[in-house]
Curated annotation (Swiss-Prot):
Its cofactor is Zn(2+). Residues 1213-1282, 1283-1344, 1345-1412, 1413-1473, 1476-1556 form the Sushi domain. It comes from Homo sapiens (Human). Residues 42-51 have a biased composition (Low complexity). Its EC number is 3.4.24.79. Residues 1-22 form the signal peptide. This is Pappalysin-1.
């Protein structure tokens, strides 16, 4: 349960809500309940925040724990050096390019020969949060390639998750011109926005390597040889900041270097220290400091140039980003910080804390909620409990006289919107809620109609089902509403949510811990506390809620102590056992730890229990059978008062830490917060040492002043603030979940990319039983956020934590507007977002004060967690703030003139030193006249080593030393090796070892990527060679479990559903639609077959998911059986699945009283559709077979080498001479006796093939293999076969055909000929198969040319040169349509006549055409009366024959011509003889109705409609009836019929029928059976996996058969364009 923690700019540590809130449920859709009016919102159809809207509304939400330090640390700015000791001159600022991501990519135009065989790229950059994926930082492209856009190399940012807006990382991709496919390597973690990063990529012809801040984070050996040949040099182009496909990067680039050699890691680290400043070396091809960008770089066509800025990128050398552990939330969970509070008693000096008891009275000041005796007794107990821990409490009692509040039931934990929702909610089941509005009562059916509106509150009708007696029980004129009003929508109801009470009282939570009283339902909840990392911790909505029945009562006083423990950051002592999500939860506590469980290493693991002693074993303890020395007497346990009596030292340290981190306002003392960590030594000379230190723990840089914004100001006088007021036009959810107020304050979503109730979503307000609303184009839905302090902004940060799967990163946020004080709205346009990296936007040249923003989205499920606005430097709001000062204390003391200096920055250089002397340094924070406690001390021996000097001092606990103070580069700032890194040498060179392709001894058992699946010595693992499964189709084929499992797959627990991407690596029953499968128990199974039957020692099952569902605590089990060669089954029992125990190894225990048996298959069965299995192995004894051993006869012995019985012989047997062609042999002896060994190494261009018993074990390109002589035979048969390059294809030479008479193995040659119309350019048309298995670079090319374009009918060629042959690919020819013809597809208003065709990459021209101009059909009243010479096309003549009398009447001929502009030259008239009216239409089909307001005369129209308003009128073919319309038929809709001049109705009413119309739920991700037909566009694609937005079909209703009415019927869907594999079985 790790929070979303960021290191934003200089580092952002998150703070968020506590554990326990449920994640957002899957949205269901049912008919809405009737009879309940909508809850009143803050305005018509709007949803507003809890505060009144206005720029100076209530105080803003507090900053996160850690203050502004954790909120944002601005880009490292070089500080003014301290006057004392700052002898070095600050280096001048360097230049950096800023790319906004909108077409500023640059192209290298300098005449440089780009590296062909090896290269190194080095760049300093600072990427913005939110990028188009992929975002190209720089890359080498081939502008001549027609077939491959990925030739060359690219360094950039892209997402590696199946979800295309999750987990963005730095990447390095490469594809040489000889390679068949591209290779991409990725950084080890998501990139950090706003941080300066030193990125390097190298390729030496054999290995690709990616470095981040000097650490090698990825490597690959897939690409080999040169990148491109000299022949294609002119085709290569170097791009910066994007690609020609607009994969543009957003952020800064500084110090760009390109080398034509692969630099070593040591050289890269050295380059990092010099910040990219190199002396001129012959290997250095390009070094850019952006002094003259236009000299070497040019923008793309129609593009612009990036901005050039001055950058002070590398000022402070100390990385102050302190991460909490995986299970922690804030700085106080950081192991280094909490260690200081544990070790230093000065950090636990006495603290006085104010708290306020809120006591409600009647108006006459009688009948208090709690008595004064209760208050005093509880206060005494509280003081006694905390006295020994240096925490004392100052009591303030607030007496509120308000009968309306006093007489109401205050509910502690009931969501009032659930009252009367037809589900019994135990937390709302109370007599004064009408037992959850009647939901928790079995109701009879009284004579409600008789009692309705009888002027009496009838309690047997006072339930939601009867509209609470028609409202009479909430009428204060009729009844005592404090006892009878249960309607949650009535203002007179008898109960209040405790948050409603808090909103009424509006008590400041920043000066006191507020204590409220509320009752719970039958659950009898004793108390509820606000965590210190909650947004509400310092607001009026924070505080503690206690049950007044227990408060201050003997035997129950420890409840308040327990809840105060929560408010001060303490978890339950049983958190690591009983409050984990599953037994695979990384926070499960197996031993006391600062990083798991309750984050205290002096509380042993314990389950939840109430006994005063160690608990017994339970069913929910994840395999724990017993617990000893549990902290049952701890205040944070659930034992009774007579048992609990203490906190542990670690808990006391946490409480003191949170009092410094969050709750300084609760304390009367003005003492500033301390610096929680010891100063760090950053460098030394012969006569000086340089120290830097961390900010104070509360993150403040300025003295706090009442009414000022100084607590929001950072170094550089930059103000950072979160939104304080939120609103949206969307309606509001009564529960507050997903409402705008959730986007106020700091980010608090724990698991980004998963739906969370702690966010705003456009869909928030919708009743979960109805269909979600859409956010219509072009504007969509929007959220408006206002900030307390209007300011001129420098940047904006937005946390978008969830985006629907049907939206990519570029479409979800379609606009952001800045709301200026002047009234102007500034649009920032659409933005690319990641769900796990915040969006950061640099605000250029705004130049005026901004007070708010509007965020627009087209995604109704999008979720926004928070927004943060950062000012420009030296903002007026911070100019008057007084900075905190620092005092450095030394032992031995500093000279008086030095000791008296107060430092404004966090750096100090001591020049008063003696070689070999021991010095200790402390730092004290000074605010006004108050001083903090001294920081922990750092001990420094002048002239000796320290963390950061490049030498590992193991006696000081150092594990590595890379000469810097940066986290995330393998060696932490405290010189400790980071997880999954290995560091070597001095100074340390660190590399991410998991997945680097090298199997090292320390990772043999842990790294599947590098070492494969670990097999213990003496055993042999066989992976499945075939498989059959119970449920499969093309989405989840069973064959994927054949062979070893994919190394890249990590086991996942607590999933909601399984994405289609999993089926590429693991099998799961995807044909079952979860959770509907839970309606009936289903058994799923797979059967794995093995090529070599063996005596099983164990069965191994590799998992990708362990079957646990997000909303359920139940663990899944599997049943495993062995199948022997006689098809008999041997049960291995039931086994619990857990990602913590993956792979699952099931030992096979043989009954020694029975004969051994050979197993040939394994059957695995389970009941959860969320189990995904990636591999099954059969483990047996290596070189030992008990079945064969038992069959040996007299005179025979078992041969392990042969694995068979052989005749026993005492004489020594030599092996035959070992002869391997194309190999070199290195034998341990010239003799070939038993035990002799020979090492076989294949020559260059040959590959080892190793066989045993004529079966190929493996083929490897590795250097050698060792064979051993065993009992007269070599234990392996080895051959060296030439590598095979396979037949060349278009990747080698485009537009060519190949001939390989010599074959395709090493050394052979193939020739190629150019296919017409391509022409050979060059002389040598031969390719050679090289030793690396790839073809050599071609020395000639086939240049594609187009012949003269063919004539286009009805068009004239306009380009004269196009009449000749030899046109290059990409060239154009222009045509113009002849009069009366136009280009197809052009609009009716402006019919285009000119068009171009292009010479394409296959040597042909794009097709062009000219189609005749057409006129609209004549009016329908003339239908059937006219004849046309050529339809309605240009020059066609249409005629109606009239009698001669028309001409005599001067009407002229009834003839019209279609003109070239698509209009008729005239119009028809009704002939004189055409008189009368149509007959009354009476032959109507059932349900059809005609309305003829103008009668039945010629030209009159009748509107068609259906008696059933849900039906539509259509025309059906004669042979089709309404009852048998096939789903693929899409009949024409009819809105009206007309009486023609021939006195006939058109269309004829007898052909018109009424059919069921389409429900308005198309495209809503639910497959509605009624809409699953062509007439309704197959429900907008909702019924096919390939077309539904969520890629998972959800039927509605859920009983709808996925093989019947809700089947995929759309003939255009992908499912019907490929072979259906359903039912196909491997086995």
């Amino acid at each position: 349960m790790r929070l979303w923690s960021w290191v934003l700019h200089l580092g952002l540590l998150s703070a968020a809500l506590g554990c326990g809130l449920a994640e957002r449920p899957r949205r269901a859709r049912r008919d809405p309940r009737a009879g309940r009016p909508p809850r009143p919102a803050a305005g018509p159809a709007t949803c507003a925040t809890r505060a009144a809207r206005g720029r100076r509304a209530s105080p803003p939400p507090p900053p996160p724990p850690g203050g502004a330090w954790e909120a944002v640390r601005v880009p490292r700015r070089r500080q003014q050096r301290e006057a004392r000791g700052a002898t070095e001159e600050p280096s001048p600022p360097s230049r950096a390019l800023y790319f906004s991501g909108r077409g500023e990519q640059l192209r290298l135009r300098a005449d440089l020969e780009l590296p062909r065989d090896a290269f190194t790229l080095q760049v300093w950059l600072r990427a913005e949060g939110g990028q188009r994926s992929p975002a190209v930082i720089t890359g080498l492209y081939d502008k001549c390639s027609y077939i491959s856009r990925d030739r060359g190399w690219v360094v950039g940012i892209h997402t590696i998750s199946d979800q295309d807006n999750k987990d963005p990382r730095y990447f390095f991709s490469l594809k040489t011109d000889r390679a068949r496919q591209v290779t991409t390597i990725n950084a080890h973690r998501s990139y950090l926005p706003g941080q300066w990063v030193y990125l390097a990529a190298t390729y030496d012809g054999q290995f690709m390597k990616l470095y981040v801040n000097g650490a090698q984070v990825a490597t690959s050996g897939e690409q080999v040889g040169g990148i491109f040949s000299p022949l294609t040099q002119k085709c290569k182009v170097l791009m910066l900041g994007g690609s020609a496909l607009n994969h543009n990067y957003r952020g800064y680039i500084e110090h760009f270097s390109l080398w034509k050699v692969a630099r070593t890691q040591r050289e890269i680290l050295s380059d990092m220290e010099t910040h990219g400043a190199h002396t001129a070396l012959p290997q250095l091809l390009l070094q850019e400091n952006w002094d003259n960008v236009k000299h070497a770089w040019s923008p793309m066509k129609d593009g612009s140039s990036p901005k050039v800025e001055f950058s002070n990128a590398h000022g402070f050398l100390l990385d102050t980003s302190l991460e909490p552990p995986l299970c922690g939330q804030t700085l106080c969970d950081n192991t280094e910080v909490i260690a200081s509070y544990n070790q230093l008693s000065s950090f636990r000096q006495p603290k006085v804390v104010r708290y306020r008891v809120v006591n409600l009275y009647e108006d006459d000041h009688k009948n208090p909620t709690v008595t004064r005796e209760q208050v005093d007794f509880q206060h005494h107990q509280l003081a006694e409990a905390f006295k020994q821990y240096n925490i004392s409490w100052e009591l303030d009692v607030l007496e509120v006289s308000n009968s309306s509040l006093r007489r109401r039931l205050i509910l502690a934990n009931c969501d009032i919107s659930k009252i009367g929702d037809e589900n019994c909610d135990p937390e709302c089941n109370h007599t004064l809620t009408g037992h959850d509005g009647g939901d928790c009562r079995h109701l009879r059916h009284p004579a409600f109609v008789k009692k309705q509106h009888n002027g009496v509150c009838d309690m047997d009708c006072n339930y939601e089902r009867f509209n609470f007696d028609g409202g009479e029980c909430c009428d204060p004129e009729i009844t005592n509403v404090t006892q009878t009003c249960f309607d949650p929508d009535s203002p007179h109801r008898a109960y209040l949510d405790v948050n409603e009470l808090k909103n009424i009282l509006k008590l400041d939570g920043s000066t006191h811990l507020n204590i409220f009283f509320a009752k719970s339902s039958e659950e009898e909840l004793a108390g509820v506390a606000t965590w210190p990392w909650d947004k509400e911790a310092l607001m009026h909505l924070g505080g503690i809620v206690l049950n007044p029945s227990f408060y201050g009562m003997p035997g129950h006083t420890h409840t308040m102590i327990h809840e105060i423990g929560h408010s001060l950051g303490l978890y339950h002592v049983f958190r690591g056992i009983s409050e984990i999500q599953s037994c695979s939860d990384p926070c499960m506590e197996t031993e006391p730890s600062f990083e798991t469980g309750d984050l205290c290493n002096d509380t042993n693991p314990a389950p939840k229990h109430k006994s005063c002693g160690d608990p017994g074993p339970g069913n929910d303890t994840c395999g724990f059978h017993s617990f000893f020395n549990t902290p049952y007497n701890n205040f944070m346990s659930y034992a009774d008062d007579d048992c609990t009596d203490s906190f542990t030292p670690n808990q006391v340290a946490r409480m003191h830490c949170y009092l410094d981190l969050v709750y300084q306002g609760w304390q009367p003392s003005r003492k500033p917060a301390p610096v929680a960590l010891a100063p760090q030594v950053l460098g030394h000379t012969t006569d000086s040492v340089t120290l830097e230190w961390f900010p104070p723990i509360d993150g403040h840089f300025f003295e706090r002043e009442l009414g000022s914004a100084c607590h929001l100001c950072l170094e550089g006088r930059i103000l950072v603030q979160y939104a304080s007021n939120a609103s949206s036009p969307m309606p509001c959810s009564p529960s507050g979940h997903w409402s705008p107020r959730e986007a106020e304050g700091h980010p608090d979503v724990e698991q980004p990319c998963k739906s969370s109730v702690r966010t705003w979503s456009p869909n928030s307000a919708v009743n979960p039983h109805t269909v979600p609303p859409a956010c219509p184009e072009p504007q969509g839905c929007y959220l408006e956020l206002e900030f307390l302090y209007p300011l001129v902004p420098e940047s904006l940060t937005i946390w978008v934590t969830f985006v629907s799967t049907d939206w990519d990163s570029s479409g979800a946020v379609n606009d952001i507007k800045l709301l200026a004080v002047s009234g102007k709205n500034i649009s920032l346009g659409p933005q690319n977002v990641f769900c796990d990296v915040p969006l950061t936007i640099r605000l250029w040249d705004v130049g005026e004060e901004v007070y708010g923003i509007q965020i627009y989205t087209l995604d109704e499920h999008l979720e926004i967690d928070a927004a943060m606005l950062t000012s420009t430097a030296d903002t007026p709001l911070c100019l008057q703030c007084k900075p905190l000062k620092y005092k450095v204390v030394r032992d031995p003391p500093l000279q008086m003139d030095v000791a008296s200096i107060l430092h404004l920055n966090r750096k100090f250089v001591d020049m008063d030193l003696n070689l070999g002397s021991v010095y200790q340094y402390w730092v004290i924070t000074i605010s006004g006249t108050e001083e903090s406690e001294p920081s922990p001390a750092v001990t420094y021996i002048h002239g000796s080593g320290y963390c950061g000097d490049g030498i590992i001092q193991k006696d000081q606990g150092e594990q590595c030393d890379d000469m810097n103070k940066i986290n995330g580069d393998g060696c932490s700032l405290f010189c400790r090796q980071e997880v999954s890194f290995n560091c070597i040498d001095e100074p340390s060179r660190c590399y991410f070892h998991d997945g680097d392709g090298v199997c090292e001894e320390f990772e043999q058992k842990t790294s599947i990527k590098d070492c494969g699946v670990y097999t213990p010595q003496g055993f042999l693992d066989q992976w499945a060679s075939n498989a059959s499964v119970s449920h499969q189709d093309q989405q989840c084929p069973g064959w994927v479990i054949i062979g070893q499992p994919a190394a890249s797959q990590v086991c996942r627990t607590k999933v909601i559903d399984l994405s289609e991407g999993i089926s590429q690596h693991a099998w799961y029953p995807c044909t079952i639609s979860y959770p509907y499968s839970q309606l009936a128990q289903t058994t799923f199974w797979l059967r794995a077959y093995f090529s070599q039957p063996m005596v099983a020692a164990a069965v191994i099952v590799h998992l990708v998911t362990d079957g646990t569902y997000y909303g359920d605590q139940k663990q899944e089990t599997i049943s495993v059986q062995l199948l022997d060669t006689k098809d008999q089954s041997h049960d291995l029992g039931l086994h619990v699945l857990s990602c913590r125990n993956n792979p699952l190894i099931i030992p096979v225990v043989h009954d020694l009283s029975q004969p051994f048996y050979h197993s040939q298959a394994v059957r695995v069965s389970f009941s959860s559709p969320l189990v995904a299995i990636s591999g099954v192995a059969l483990r047996s004894f290596d070189n030992f077979d008990p079945v064969t051993l038992s069959s040996c006869q007299r005179g025979e012995t078992y041969s392990p080498a042969e694995q068979s019985c052989v005749h026993f012989a005492c004489e020594k047997t030599d092996c035959p001479e070992l002869a391997v062609e194309n190999a070199s042999l290195n034998c341990s002896s010239s003799d070939r006796y038993h035990g002799a060994q020979c090492t076989v190494s294949c020559r260059t261009g040959y590959v080892l093939q190793i066989r045993r018993d004529d079966e190929l074990i493996k083929s490897q390109t590795g250097p050698s293999v060792t064979v051993t002589c065993t009992e007269g035979k070599w234990n392996k048969q080895v051959a060296c076969e030439p590598v095979d390059c396979s037949i060349p294809d278009h990747h080698q030479v485009y537009a060519a055909s190949f001939s390989c008479p010599e074959g395709t193995t090493f050394g052979s040659q193939c020739s190629f000929q150019c296919r017409h119309p391509a022409q050979l350019k060059g002389n040598n048309s031969l390719l050679t198969c090289m030793e690396d298995g790839l073809w050599s670079f071609p020395e000639a090319l086939c240049e594609l040319m187009c012949l003269a374009p063919p004539p286009v009918p009805n068009a004239d060629l306009q380009t004269a040169r196009c009449r000749e042959n030899k046109h290059k690919v990409g060239s154009f020819c222009k045509y113009k349509c002849k009069p009366g013809y136009h280009v197809p597809g052009s609009s009716r208003k402006s019919k285009k006549r000119a068009f171009k065709t292009q010479c394409t990459q296959d040597g042909s021209w794009q097709e062009g055409a000219c189609v005749p101009v057409t006129c609209d059909p004549p009016p329908p009243k003339f239908h059937g009366l006219y004849q046309c010479t050529n339809g309605f096309q240009f020059n066609s003549e249409c005629r109606i024959k009239c009698e001669d009398s028309d001409a005599s009447q001067g009407l002229g001929s009834n003839v019209i011509h279609c003109r070239k502009d698509g209009t008729w030259n005239g119009s028809f008239h009704v002939c004189q003889e055409m008189q009368g009216q149509c007959s009354v239409p009476n032959e109507l089909n059932s349900n059809l109705k005609l309305q003829c307001p103008d009668g039945y005369a010629i030209g009159s129209e009748c509107a068609t409609s259906c008696l059933d308003h849900n039906s539509e009128s259509i025309i059906l073919p004669m042979n089709v009836t309404v009852r048998d319309i096939p789903h693929w038929l899409n009949p024409t809709r009819v809105e009206r019929v007309v009486c023609t001049a021939g006195l006939k109705w058109y269309p004829h009413p007898a052909l018109i029928h009424c059919v069921k119309g389409c429900e308005p739920f198309m495209g809503d991700n639910y497959c509605d059976a009624i809409n699953n037909r062509a007439f309704c566009n197959y429900d907008g694609g909702d019924c096919c996996t390939s077309t539904v937005k969520t890629k998972k079909v959800t039927p509605f209703p859920m009983s709808c058969d996925l093989q019947g009415d809700c089947a995929c019927r759309d003939p255009q869907a992908q499912e019907h364009s490929r072979k259906d594999l359903r039912g196909y079985s491997h086995g």
